[in-house]
Regions:
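Short sequence/structural segments immediately N-terminal
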Residues: 29-31, 80
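Sec/Tat signal peptide C-region and signal peptidase I cleavage site
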Residues: 16-22
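The canonical Cys-X-X-Cys-His
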Residues: 33-40, 102
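Bacterial N-terminal signal peptides that target proteins for export
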Residues: 1-8
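Axial heme c-ligation environment in periplasmic c-type cytochrome domains
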Residues: 45-56, 72-98
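An amphipathic alpha-helix signature
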Residues: 26, 46, 63-71, 96-103, ...
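Gly/Gly-Pro-rich "capping" loops immediately C-terminal to redox-active cysteine motifs
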Residues: 30, 39-69
Length: 109
């Protein structure tokens, strides 16, 4: 019985911490202006973040590639979605640590 309670508690902690990470990611996205062009589940101007996560799933270089893209901006990776509209650079307007948190949030979707 003790193991069941411990397992339930650990499972609940994982779910709650995942929710906290998701909430922090969305709050950071709102504060940084990301939601002007992106949404989690649907295309706005830029691709849906779920689509970004799916495209880069299993790619060991994904985090570095996306952090660089968010910092520097650019175009070309999602032309079929954006119609060629480039992503603006977010560095130095958004701190590097916050950009990394945003990318981690997106890749975890």
């Amino acid at each position: 019985m003790k193991n069941k309670v411990l397992g339930l508690g650990l499972g609940l902690a994982v779910v709650m911490s995942g929710s906290a990470v998701a909430a922090e990611g969305l709050d950071l996205a709102k504060a940084s202006g990301c939601l002007a062009c992106h949404a989690v589940e649907k295309k706005v101007v830029g691709p849906a973040w779920q689509d970004v996560a799916a495209k880069y799933k299993g790619d060991a270089a994904a985090r570095d590639v996306l952090v660089s893209k968010v910092k520097a901006g650019g175009k070309g990776n999602w032309n079929e979605v954006t119609g060629g509209v480039p992503m603006p650079p977010y560095s130095p307007r958004v701190a590097d640590a916050d950009i990394e948190k945003l990318v981690d949030f997106i890749l975890a979707l």
